[in-house]
Amino acid sequence: MRVIKIRLYFVGQLITKNIIMRVLIACEESQAVVKRYRALGHDAYSCDIEPCSGGHPEWHIMGDVTPLLKQKWDLIIAFPPCTYMTNGGAVRMYPKKGEICPDRYAKAMEAKAFFMLFYEADCPHICIENPMPMNIIGLPEKSQIVQPYQFGDPFSKKTYLWLKGLPKLEPTNILTE
């Protein structure tokens, strides 16, 4: 691939780069993000345990992402499953006041271990996206909290980002109502 001056979109933000990056979009079957990076000329791949629904199986690696994290990537964007870590699931973690559901806790710790594979990956640029986690999970401190309404979508959903080697996102189109 030839090197071209491109505009790199990092989750909606514009960064000018003069490189073609090797990009892994983990836990993404829709290919919405990978298509944006491909359109900018990057060597981008989605990976998920599900088949892709975005129409480009040639850009999709169906299977476990773990071995891929040992490869060289310039950027990893990960959307790990949040089912057992999210604060919204606290009612299931504590079915009775003061009592933790052991099965749910074990699944939460498995989910944390999977999350940490991305967080600790040997890659210069990493973004991990997830909703607000329960404190009991013990995830590393987030880098930033964003809301869809800060970027032109009329929704409220507190989203946490863990960033490595990337700038914080700046709101681009704040909706007030």
Task: Enumerate the language-model features and the residues they cover.
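Extreme N-terminal basic, low-complexity initiation segments
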Residues: 2-4
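Conserved active-site and SAM-binding loop architecture
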Residues: 7-177
